[in-house]
Swiss-Prot record:
The gene is pheS. Its cofactor is Mg(2+). It is found in: Cytoplasm. Keywords: Aminoacyl-tRNA synthetase, ATP-binding, Cytoplasm, Ligase, Magnesium, Metal-binding, Nucleotide-binding, Protein biosynthesis. This is Phenylalanine--tRNA ligase alpha subunit. The lineage of its organism: Bacteria, Pseudomonadati, Chlamydiota, Chlamydiia, Chlamydiales. It comes from Chlamydia trachomatis serovar A (strain ATCC VR-571B / DSM 19440 / HAR-13). GO terms for molecular function: ATP binding; magnesium ion binding; phenylalanine-tRNA ligase activity; tRNA binding.
Amino acid sequence: MTIQEELEAIKQQFSCDVSLAHSSKDLFDVKVKYLGKKGIFRGFADQLRKCPIEQKATVGASINACKQYVEEVLLERGKAVLAKEEAEEFLKEKIDISLPGSEEAALGGKHVIKKVLDDVVDIFVRFGFCVREAPNIESEKNNFSLLNFEGDHPARQMQDTFYLDPTTVLRTHTSNVQSRELARNKPPVRIVAPGECFRNEDVSARSHVIFHQVEAFCVDKDISFSDLTSMLAGFYHIFFGRKVELRFRHSYFPFVEPGIEVDISCECHGAGCSLCKHSGWLEVAGAGMIHPNVLRKASIDPEEYSGYALGMGIERLAMLKYGISDIRLFSENDLRFLRQFS
């Protein structure tokens, strides 16, 4: 039998072996049989050395062509077998959703932050506010400049704000909704803006680098400070489910004038407890009348229109409503904690 006849016989036998290989292991065995260190094609090396010089080129080309054919068939067959095996494995792992679920696998529920956030927004919607959102990644202009933060204001510094580049930040408050909405909508406007905020702070029991905030603002003719205080009283009465006393302390915020810190009476009724640090009061929000400069930057005449704005931290409200002492619990994914609110 000549080498050419032998190669043809090998191709026929190889085709038979491949057709009977139905798994990756079968194909690997075929590959070893033909292409392995002790495989069939290794035997042709000795035959090629014994060939007359004038036949070596032709014989070598025939051997290589046959070997290449074997490699290509193995590759294509391997793809088909692998796809078949993956499909079979997928069917084995597929969950039969028609089966009844385990009673132990209870349905999940809203995270306590989501629950409180929805409750807060729902109250403002009942008060006639529209829900609006803005990006977490914000321009320095919308986050600071349009809200009357001067260029040297401490809040702009790297130690308080996460800068992505010299003019882009992770928003430090949801007040960026105010700068955007006042620029595109003329009064009257009543907006509530929920969302995540980011500040470069040390993580502790009372502060975190990521927190949730709701800002609400109203701009119209003849809006007064009493409109703000009456709205706050109504909100906290509904949210806490009890009548609360409010206390206002003068404070400074660049985007409002006058600015106030809002405190509510503690459930200890002034007796003093660890929650209120024995003061009888709980700090819940910052608020005030929108600064005339903010209105001017939005092309709104402060002589004709006025407005109020307020911001409240959702984690803070959740901690007060449910008696939670550590803000870090909200992000630790401890089911023992989370299941209390689902």
